[in-house]
């Protein structure tokens, strides 16, 4: 079982060169990474530092979190921070509601997509659909509440749409599985088990690790569990030849004991509530629009009982409201920072 940097080093020195889509990558098949203490944020100042909101990668991490929490399948918001998204929309007929949409908004799959979104067959048999109409995350939570030792609390990050002709965004993460088990000292841990079919160790895993950690920590917090060890099983672990120089820099840092992964910690809900209210005040200072007052008030009210849902509502508003699309990228960056920091400490 490897750490992030061990995995990267093994790709470099043991990986094979392949050329999917005619692009050279160095790749290892069937690797595993183990993460403890939520150390999922790369902090290598001057080289790659997602903890710094001023770096390109730091800005992308925060924008991606806001976009994920919005549940939006559109690319206009996230394309401001990662241009590749503008090329990944589905190429369906104009009549298809998923035309130009993407399939890899992980927040949609976790917090918005019903657990049985595509099981219309159940409705034909007049079966009770209420339990499976709820989003996957809460379905998994319910399974653990019914049986704390359940092996069924699993989230599916894919859907049948990805198999259609015209799809450019074939979802990488496949599943995220939660199991609660008691350790030898009598404490409970929530095991956060992720399977991903294809993982770019530089441009993908850097941002995926924080997301998976957040989802696992949120589930654990709902059960009063503090420790959330995470295992990531990667079918294709690789990096592109264009990132070779950066890979060499990171490996060299590790040789001098200067490579750092730091912890991303989900705030206590009470702290989150106060910070979400502060974030709303900040957003209102830029958008003193009476048409938005009702939404802002609902976010503040919701933050008292369910701060994560409050964040989802705020992010959904920012990503989808036309007013927010007319402001500068710098303002959006600062809003992203406010929201990210209201949820996490690091």
Question: What are these model-predicted stretches?
Answer:
Residues 1-346:
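Terminal, non-catalytic protein-protein interaction segments that mediate quaternary/complex assembly
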């Amino acid at each position: 079982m490897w750490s992030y940097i061990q995995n990267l080093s093994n790709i470099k020195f043991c990986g094979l060169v392949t050329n999917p889509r005619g692009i050279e990558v160095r790749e290892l098949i069937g690797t595993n990474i183990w993460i403890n203490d939520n150390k999922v944020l790369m902090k290598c100042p001057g080289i790659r530092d997602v903890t710094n909101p001023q770096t390109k990668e730091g800005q992308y991490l925060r924008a991606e979190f806001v976009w994920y929490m919005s549940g939006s399948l559109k690319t206009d918001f996230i394309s401001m921070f990662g241009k590749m998204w503008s090329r990944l929309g589905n190429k369906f007929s104009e009549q298809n509601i998923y035309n130009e949409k993407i399939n890899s908004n992980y927040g949609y799959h976790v917090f918005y997509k019903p657990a049985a979104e595509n099981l219309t067959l159940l409705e034909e048999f007049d079966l009770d659909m209420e339990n499976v109409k709820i989003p996957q995350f809460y379905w998994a939570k319910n399974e653990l509440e019914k049986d704390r030792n359940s092996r069924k609390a699993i989230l599916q990050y894919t859907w049948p749409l990805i198999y259609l002709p015209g799809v450019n965004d074939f979802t990488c993460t496949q599943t995220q599985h939660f199991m609660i088990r008691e350790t030898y000292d009598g404490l409970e841990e929530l095991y956060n088990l992720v399977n991903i079919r294809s993982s770019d160790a530089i441009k993908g895993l850097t941002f995926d690790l924080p997301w998976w950690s957040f989802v696992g920590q949120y589930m654990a917090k709902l059960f009063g569990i503090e420790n959330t060890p995470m295992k990531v099983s990667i079918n294709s672990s690789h990096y592109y030849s264009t990132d070779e120089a950066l890979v060499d820099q990171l490996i060299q840092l590790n040789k001098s004991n200067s490579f750092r992964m730091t912890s991303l910690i989900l705030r206590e809900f009470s702290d989150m509530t106060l910070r979400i209210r502060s974030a709303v005040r900040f957003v209102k200072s830029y958008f003193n629009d009476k048409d938005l007052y009702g939404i802002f008030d609902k976010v503040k009210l919701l933050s008292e009982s369910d701060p994560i849902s409050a964040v989802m509502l705020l992010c959904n508003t920012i990503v989808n409201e036309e007013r927010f699309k007319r402001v500068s990228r710098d303002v959006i960056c600062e809003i992203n920072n406010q929201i990210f920091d209201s949820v996490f400490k690091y």
